[in-house]
Amino acid sequence: MIKDFVAIDLETTGLSPYDNKIIELGAVRYRDGKPVDQYNTLINPGVHIPERITEITGIDDDMVSKAPYIDDELDRIMEFIGNDVILGHNVIFDYTFIAGALAGHSIEYSAEAIDTLKFAKKVLSAN
């Protein structure tokens, strides 16, 4: 069982890492299975947040207007995540947005990722 990892969750302006932007990133670092640190920031996407996304996330244009842009926050995000295993629900979604932002700076990123959605599907289908 993995006891050291970073759990992440993103909110975005849509589903495509090519066409949409990150608007919030939250992460919690675990050591020995216990939370030891957290990181959370709103991100200014530089574009209008669609009304539907505001309905889903509660995040609107005013909330992100003074938030940092993803380019200004990437170093802090990656410093927090480090080389840890990434854990999240449908984590491939979050992973592709982060990797896409890094690729825009010619930074390759690969880390082990554990998707709790896959575990949930297995558990639920077994019952």
Stretches found by the model and what they are:
Residues M1-E112, S125-A126:
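Conserved non-catalytic scaffold segment of RNase H-like nuclease domains
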